[in-house]
Amino acid sequence: MGVHLEVLDTGEQLMVPGDVLEEENKGTLWKFLLSGAMAGAVSRTGTAPLDRARVYMQVYSSKSNFRHLLSGLRSLVQEGGIRSLWRGNGINVLKIAPEYAIKFSVFEQSRNFFYGVHTSPSFQERVVAGSLAVAISQTLINPMEVLKTRLTLRFTGQYKGLLDCARQILERDGTRALYRGYLPNMLGIIPYACTDLAVYELLRCLWQKSGRDMKDPSGLVSLSSVTLSTTCGQMASYPLTLVRTRMQAQDTVEGSNPTMLGVFKRILNQQGWPGLYRGMTPTLLKVLPAGGISYLVYEAMKKTLGVQVLSR
């Protein structure tokens, strides 16, 4: 757990496995990346109903049937059947490959730069490296995030598919619509990365004080630590995540374009501070199963592909 980049996919953040970063493992890089991508795909598919409920609660929280998780899920099933709970999952899985590859490449370059300055990167340097990796990957896949949000929220018959959704957005709002929510997305990276890594470092210190070997913790300890730190990071950046989703979901109406501050004010005026945490329940509920599924699938894929992890 020396480098906080475990294989954990919560649906919001896909992290690069730390064992990929060891020099001796570079020859089997494609196997690690394939294992991670498969883990993310299975994880997101398994928790897709909770993710769709989260998006609906964030966007339509003023409607009585989407104020609570169970009533929201019931409404979704009534509108489109059981299969509708997986709307938007296709592109959510599709964007794993570019997200994973970009995040890994940027983090690898940042890591090499900092290792050239120090033997071991400091806390601040790891925050910078991780934040830079997330920022660049999110910049490049933001259009896919917008499409994912629109497809997740679509009602039966609204779009014929991914390409039809993209065409309608471009015809109605232009290319700028594909970067709706970009600013709150970027701003949310800092509190997420700082909180995530700070909690992880705290847990690492507590583990070391217990007198146990920090270099070889059990899978359960590693999974629990990353899950808890990731959850805290999500809570710290959640209001910005909610605003991002609201902005991505909104169409341009009569030439108006929703701004980040405008969405913040609207939420606070209509729902108060609690409104900034709408949809938090399904978000928290999916963290543990998503992390557990991705971890187990990743380990199973490595075993299937015959990967032997070699560390320095």
Swiss-Prot record:
Keyword set includes Lipid biosynthesis: no
TM helices/strands, residue ranges: 33-50, 88-107, 131-144, 182-200, 219-243, 279-298
Solcar repeat start-end pairs: 27-113, 121-206, 217-304
InterPro entries associated with the record: Mit_carrier (IPR002067), Mitochondrial_sb/sol_carrier (IPR018108), Mt_carrier_dom_sf (IPR023395)
Main location class: mitochondrion
Catalytic activity: Mg(2+)(out) + phosphate(in) + ATP(out) = Mg(2+)(in) + phosphate(out) + ATP(in); ADP(out) + phosphate(in) + H(+)(out) = ADP(in) + phosphate(out) + H(+)(in)
Family annotation (Gene3D superfamilies): Mitochondrial carrier domain
Function, as annotated: Calcium-independent ATP-Mg/Pi exchanger that catalyzes the electroneutral exchange of Mg-ATP or free ADP against an hydrogenphosphate and participates in the net transport of adenine nucleotides across the mitochondria inner membrane.
Protein family according to the UniProt entry: Belongs to the mitochondrial carrier (TC 2.A.29) family.
Name of the featured protein: Calcium-independent mitochondrial carrier protein SCaMC-3L
Gene from which the chain derives: Slc25a41
